[in-house]
Every structure is written in C-alpha cells, then in structure tokens.
Amino acid sequence: MSVDPKKLNKEVAKRRTFAIISHPDAGKTTMTEKLLLWGQAIQVVGEVKGRKTDRHATSDWMSMEQERGISITTSVMQFPYQEHVVNLLDTPGHADFSEDTYRTLTAVDSALMMVDGAKGVEERTIKLMEVCRMRDTPIISFVNKLDRQIREPLELLSEIEAVLKIKCIPITWPIGMGQDFVGVYHLTENKTYFYEKGRGGEMTVSETREGYDYPDIRERLGALMFASFEESLELVQMALEDFDVDEFLAGEMTPVLFGTALGNFGVNMVLDTLIKYSPPPKAHPTNEREVAATETTFSGFVFKIQANMDPRHRDRIAFLRVCSGKYEKGMKLKHVRLGKDVRIADALTFLAGDRAALEEAYPGDIIGLHNHGTISIGDSFTEGEELNFTGIPHFAPELFRRVILKDPLKSKALQKGLQQLSEEGATQVFMPQINNDLILGAVGVLQFEVVAHRLKEEYKVQCIFEPVSIATVRWIHCDDEVALAKFKRKAHDQLSLDGGGHLTYLAPSRVNLQLMQDRYPEVTFSNTREH
C-alpha cells in the first residue's frame, strides 16, 4: 500500500510506547489509572482498592486479577497527550509472571520505573532492570507514596544508583512527606508545585510559585524540617550533573521525579518528561537486517497472545507491535513463519478490555489480531518481505506439575484449554513420550492457580495438579543425526514434546542434566527457545 513518507515520519515522531516496571504494591496499577485520566481515556478512576464495588481498576480485567488485586496479564492502552500518541503497556508486577513481562519489554521503547518511597529498591525491580539493561531501554524513575512517611530522598537516590547501577538526575525534589507533604520543588524551573489533598480522582493543575522559601511552607514544616529540606536540596544542587539525553537514551542515566500516584500528584510531570525525552519508535533487529520505523512497508511482530479477553467471545487475541510502515484496515499481510498471505480486516485497538475496531496504526502502536490457533508468540507479519524479528524468548520453567483431570470425559477440553493458555506464554505444556501424561511447567506457583482457575471458568474443566519429579527442562538441538538418534534411544524415558512440538529433555535432577551434557557433548541442551 502506498504510504506518504512525510505523514509516516510525522506519525512516528508523535508516538511514545512504554511500560511501567515495579515491585508488586509499588502503586503501578494506580499510576496506570492516573495516566489514563490525564490522557482523558477514562472519566471515572476505578481505584484498585474499591474491591467491593464493580469499579475495578481498568487495567486489571480478568476475574482472578480483580479478586486478588494483582495484575496478571499485560494490558495495552492507547491515549492522546499533548499532540502525541502514548501507548502504555501494563506489565504484571507479580513475581511469577516474569516471562510475560520480559516479552512485553521487547515491545516498548522506554520504561517508567516506580519505586515505593518507604521501601526503596526491591528485588522484582532489580530483575526487571536487568531485562531493560540487556536492551539499553531508557528509564524514567518515579518515587511514589510521598503522601506517606518515606525514607530520606538522598538515601533513596544513592540506593537506586548503587543497586541498579544507573545515574540519577532529580528533576523534582520533595518538600516534606506524609502528613507534612507540601509538594515538590522543580530544580530546572525553580518553581514549587503544591500538593492538594483529596484531589486524587481529578485532573488538577497544581498551584505553583517561584522558588520555595515562603513563610507558610516554613510554618507547615517547622524550623527543623525546613532546614533539613534546604540542606538536602543544596547537596543535590551541588552534585547535580546536567541531564545528558544521550546517556538517558543509552539507559545509563535516569531522570527522577517524586509524587503520589494515589493523590494524582506528579503524574502529569511523568507524562511531560516522557514526551520530552523518551525516544519515538526505534529500529528493530531481525535475522535478515535492521528495520527502521520510518520504512514505508509494514512490518511487526507478535509478543503476546491472550486467550478469552472477552468471555462473551471465546477468542484469542495476538498482540502485535507495529515496527514499520502503516497498518490499514483490510490490508493483505504475509505471515512469515507459515509463508501464507492473510487479509487483516478486523484488527483491534485497546483500552484494557475495551476493544475498538481499528482503521489504521503506525510504528509503536500495538494492535490485536484475532487468532484461531495459527499465530504464535514471535511471529512476524510483513507486506511480503522475509523478515524474522529476534529476541523474543521462551524460558525454561522452574516448577512442574502433572495435570490430573477430575472428569476423564473432558480430556479433549483439557488439552484445548492447556494448549490455548500455554500459547499465551505464561505456562508451558510438555507431553512425555513414555505415557499420556500432561506436564505443566511454570516460573512460579501462582501460575498453576491461575491455570486451574481459568480452566474452570473459561473451559469448564476441573483438574488438580500433583508434584512430579522433574527438576528442569532443556530444549534439544543436534545437527548430527546419528548422534541425535543415539541420544534419543538412551534418553527416551526423559524426552517430551512441548506445546510447539519441539523436542525437550525433562531432567529428574540437576546432577542428571550435567551427566547427560557431559555424555553427549554434540547435543545442545538449551534453557531458552526463541519463538
């Protein structure tokens, strides 16, 4: 399809695609809500705490998430802000869903890291930062919960620098905290932004004043606290380096803002910083070449599959990140892995669970494709060119359970359910070659609960899981057919096929795995598999 290069460049420059990363309970879902409020994508803020009402947080749309108050699946939300188009990918904050989160981070151009001001850098944040590091993702930092007692801001900054190995450049500095939270002082604007309590559900423009030294602020904080604020501010100003955009884009430096997501204070500053500094859609690597966002032919890759987004339509949606060109309704695309041309007439755009038919989409946008079992995570779609996007892995699960069906007559429904749920990539199914068992592998215990809950709710299948003596799994590759055949004969009892039909070795112990690797050096035992 003919695309006007000028218009394409303009649309690419307007896009900002980012994800929020944080430890559970750092306020990520609340932040998502408030960002949507500023983007005027929602009128009523359904705060997460309102569990007794029907107004659950917009981005937690699966019933189990609403019961538990944790984000399990990655939602995608698009909203306008200051003549830009913002695509926000909400990632699961719960530790068990790291694989889904990892793949989401392959589809964004920057990330917002949220730190709980009372707790500082937590373990989950460290893990997610490692993923961002691998891709040099630019990071904006937000220290949350200033309306409560938090740790000393200087101490928090040193911890972020020491633990996450990233240079911090404060953009704002807090004046007081908890009951005495006055607001923030903007270091480059030399202005104080005042916090007003009880305005969390509204878009309010804060009162601002030049500088920070005012009698009412001194009175509110008291002499001791005001002196402590001035002292910390002086230290920050003395040590403050200039903000270096190149260092930020390389993921080596992070601008830091302070505020409260619940109180909707500092959220618009996050959006302003995102628009000002974060990069528009970047080039993406493929096995064949690098694809620039401004190329006029369409290309994109699938980073996530979600079954049953709408229980009313038993459907599966493949989430595709547009990498280049323009999607237009009804266009013909090549599904590269299958070598087939498909006409995409009904792609979707999202506001967490609300789906709207899409007329056009540009690089950086996330679109939903209806999937009837033919699309897999990692698949590329192009206007004909043979391109395979790289860097979207499957990880070896760490926990395994045998699936026991309560009603043997439902084995077909069970297989279908497990197959579809494993296509989403949070769990993996293995079929041992010596029996008819179904083995489920996951990164964390919570995933087994989620699968059982969803099989019951969405597929009307009840099952239980029992422990199985598998320590880990490895994908098997071997170019030497004779050596592979010999290995298959000897290891037959431990071999299985995964959901995609790939040969895997189910190791009963780490020692056994090491022995097999030593015994068969020509066989590759891989702990990840690219999609």
Swiss-Prot record:
It holds the Pfam family GTP_EFTU. It is found in: Cytoplasm. The keyword RNA-binding does not apply. GTP binds at residues 22-29, 90-94, 144-147. HAMAP family: Rel_fac_3. NCBIfam families: prfC (TIGR00503), PRK00741.1 (NF001964), small_GTP (TIGR00231). Belongs to the TRAFAC class translation factor GTPase superfamily. Classic translation factor GTPase family. PrfC subfamily. This is Peptide chain release factor 3. The gene is prfC.
